[in-house]
Each structure stands twice: as C-alpha cells, then as structure tokens.
Design a protein with these regions (language model features):
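Intrinsically disordered, low-complexity
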Residues: 22-66, 160, 165
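Positively charged n-region of N-terminal signal peptides that target proteins for export
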Residues: 1-4
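Short, surface-exposed secondary-structure junctions/capping segments
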Residues: 61-78
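Generic structural motif
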Residues: 19, 35, 56-58, 96-98, ...
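Bacterial N-terminal signal peptides
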Residues: 7-17
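Structural motif
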Residues: 36-38, 75, 114
C-alpha cells in the first residue's frame, strides 16, 4: 500500500513538472526601441526574447496624424489579436490614446489607427528576415511570420506596450 502511494505521488509530481515545463512563460510587457529596431518581450522585468523589427516607412519621430507613416511612441496595450490578418497574424496596439487623439485634433487632423505588430503578407513571406532591410510599414511593427507565430503564443491581450524613440 505504501509503495503504491509513493508511486502515485511520483507520477503526480512528474506530471505537474512536465505540464509546468510545457507551458511557456507569457510576456507581461513589450518594449519597442525604434532607434534600435528592436522589440523585447518581458516578464517580471526579465527579457524573454528580443526581435529585430521593421517600422513605419518614416521611422524617426512619433506618429502625429493619419497617413504620416510613423510608428507611434508612448504607452499602450495589446487590445486585440487577429488570426485572419492579411499579414499572417497580428496583435493590435491600442493607439490612439486619448492624448494622441487630442494632439491630432489640435493639428486639425485624425490620429490614424490600425497600428499592429504583424508578420508578412503571403506574397512577401518568402522574404523572411530580409524584410527588415528597410522600414516599410504604414506605422506598424513587422516581424517574420515564424516570429509572429512565436509572439502570438507569448503575448496575451492586455499586455502592456511601451514604444520608445
């Protein structure tokens, strides 16, 4: 009887250990450094993974108005995921904030929107990491399709996003 209890306990502990090992640690924050063309996923202040990224085709300076092709700067969250994106998979960044909207209003324009972290459209997927040779998006943050698949698993809706110059 005692042997059976020990065996059962060992099986349960091993099973829990394997389950814990299989579940990836999820990010609680994303930090995008525009000047370095990098995006880091963090958990508890520790870097889980860093990716090289392509940005808006006018990468210097914060996004101010719709159509300026700039990637925004500031604090946002991931507020939605799109498994049917034309860019393979995408995570929506909560731009524009109330401050972004007010700034655009003062400039007599709209702030724009649809800022995402995304992969590559099907016709360009073959480029893989070569897509990073130039900044080409309308203001989004682009990674390879393999990378967005990994990011998709690690980043839940509600994750904080900090975009720095």
């Amino acid at each position: 009887m005692r042997t059976r209890s020990i065996q059962l306990t060992a099986v349960l502990i091993l099973g829990l250990h394997r389950a814990a090992m299989a579940a990836p640690v999820q990010a609680d924050k994303i930090v995008i450094l525009k000047s370095a063309h990098s995006m880091s996923l963090l958990n508890g202040g520790k870097t889980l993974k860093t990716y090289k990224v392509a940005l808006g085709s006018v990468p210097v300076g914060p996004k101010r108005v719709e159509g300026d092709h700039k990637t925004p700067e500031g604090d946002y969250i991931i507020d939605a995921k799109n498994a049917h994106s034309q860019f393979h998979l995408s995570l929506h960044i909560s731009y524009p904030s109330a401050a972004d909207q007010e700034r655009a209003r003062r400039l007599g324009s709209r702030p724009g929107g649809a800022i995402m972290i995304h992969g590559l459209a099907a016709p360009f997927a073959y480029l893989g990491p070569l897509h990073r040779q130039t900044d080409w998006t309308d203001g989004c943050v682009a990674v390879t399709n393999a990378e967005i698949e990994e990011i998709w698993k690690l980043v839940p809706v509600g994750t904080k996003v900090e975009i720095r110059p």
